[in-house]
């Protein structure tokens, strides 16, 4: 769980080197596609060549790039870079016009079997098997998509709203730490590797963006019922200003506990006296295990 570094040095994390590669110009791609973007549909095209070139360099040396998944390919500016580092790339694009453009623009790569185009909404189509996902995600559905991707146990490098990314990576005891932090860090070690200004996009979004890297991890705890664990975390954080003791009692209707008092009686006082924002994912897992055994 590492905090943001604006424009951090990619060479410190990976040997990926795109020097000398001749990539398609993002502005030229937009002109050929005949699109300008639509903020009402979360359509902001990443047009800064420097940012686009850096994105693949945040891959760790150990990352398997056999099959890269990209969600929201747009005009293909990032797709072009991903084809330089991946054996096969599959993109999901919901805009029919853009999907048709991608099939024409990258026809050679498609014919060579290196690029697959899936036309549809990423939340509705069946996600293909992949070894890593690198995407500029539609911000309005970032959370839903990420919690489809994180359980796949594959590395992710994704662009999200800066505030959202910082919440994912936040440490216990900080203002940004919350349900999103615990849930994301249950699956992965999350790091904000770069912050990106609105000027890197066209049209410009109203907020800063952030690139996050999520590396799958094996938790130092065991959760027997993952669905209940995530629901319990959600419930307790709805009363983050209360002590955990009171939060468990007051949110039994959310966590679906029948006997919350039994949970409180069985739990460690050192945990019950804290607030949700101070508990680590491991401590939440300890409480959730007790809740599942004593409260249901």
From Swiss-Prot:
One of its GO terms (molecular function) is rRNA (adenine-N6,N6-)-dimethyltransferase activity. Pfam families: RrnaAD (PF00398). Keywords: Cytoplasm, Methyltransferase, RNA-binding, rRNA processing, S-adenosyl-L-methionine, Transferase. It is found in: Cytoplasm. Residues 1-25 are annotated as: Disordered. It comes from the Archaea. PROSITE patterns: RRNA_A_DIMETH, SAM_RNA_A_N6_MT. InterPro entries: KsgA/Erm, rRNA_Ade_diMease-like_C, rRNA_Ade_Mease_Trfase_CS, rRNA_Ade_methylase_Trfase_N, rRNA_adenine_dimethylase, SAM-dependent_MTases_sf. The keyword Plastid does not apply. Its EC number is 2.1.1.-. Its main location: cytoplasm. Belongs to the class I-like SAM-binding methyltransferase superfamily. rRNA adenine N(6)-methyltransferase family. RsmA subfamily. This is Probable ribosomal RNA small subunit methyltransferase A. The lineage of its organism: Archaea, Methanobacteriati, Methanobacteriota, Stenosarchaea group, Halobacteria.
